């Protein structure tokens, strides 16, 4: 099977949990499948050459799409005005979306795989069968942060919590397969069919 994997960050070096999870998922998927990797990159200091070397043994094709800080600021504003979670706005870019769509058309994968809801906007309307790895429940993390935030930041964290919770629900039916780290996390997804999450 040919699988198109979309990540919000280049999964190298392995200094963060989401990068480590993505790297291990790619290794596992590559055992019996052809992996087409596409990773967004907002880090100017990222060593793309080193990352490419580390990932090449497991991927048939690797594409890194750079997102500038200016573009991030513009898209954060757009997300805020549209009612989307700020975290989704941070990683969304219209030019990147076009590139991703063209990559999908070119490679004709059998399955799309997106890591975290941060990349869901790029994949949710594609016709190909698709999987979303919720990883964990971002809305609950935001709720916890709102509880310890200074009073002047609470409205912002609470707004993001509500938006994330709604978005986690809204994208559920756009994906054929859903995965998550634990049953405990799964139970926090606000959807009547959450038991379908693997």
Predicted regions and their residues:
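Structural motif
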Residues: 2, 110-111, 177
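Helix N-cap/beta->alpha junction signal
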Residues: 116, 134-136, 182-183
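A short, active-site helix/loop in glycosyltransferases that binds the activated sugar's phosphate group
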Residues: 46-51, 121-122, 161-195
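Short N-terminal targeting/anchoring amphipathic segment
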Residues: 100-119, 128-131
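N-terminal subdomain of nucleotide-sugar transferases
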Residues: 1-63
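A conserved catalytic-core segment of Leloir-type glycosyltransferases
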Residues: 40-99, 106
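Acceptor-binding helix/loop patch of EC 2.4 sugar-transfer enzymes
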Residues: 69-89, 131-169
């Amino acid at each position: 099977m040919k699988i198109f994997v979309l990540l919000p960050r280049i999964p190298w070096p392995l200094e963060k949990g989401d990068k480590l999870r993505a790297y291990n998922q790619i290794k596992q998927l590559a055992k019996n499948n052809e992996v087409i990797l596409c990773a967004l990159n907002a880090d100017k200091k990222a060593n793309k050459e080193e990352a490419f070397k580390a990932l090449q043994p497991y991927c048939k094709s690797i594409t890194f799409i750079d997102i500038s800080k200016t573009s991030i600021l513009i898209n954060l504003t757009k997300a805020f005005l549209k009612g989307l979670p700020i975290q989704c706005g941070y990683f969304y870019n219209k030019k990147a979306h076009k590139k991703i769509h063209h990559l999908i058309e070119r490679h004709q994968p059998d399955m799309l795989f997106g890591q975290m809801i941060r990349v869901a906007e790029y994949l949710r309307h594609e016709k190909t069968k698709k999987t979303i790895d919720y990883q964990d429940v971002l809305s609950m993390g935001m709720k916890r942060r709102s509880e310890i935030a200074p009073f002047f930041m609470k409205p912002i964290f609470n707004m993001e919590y509500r938006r994330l919770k709604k978005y986690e629900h809204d994208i559920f039916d756009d994906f054929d397969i859903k995965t998550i780290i634990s049953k405990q996390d799964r139970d926090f997804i606000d959807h009547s069919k959450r038991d379908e999450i693997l």
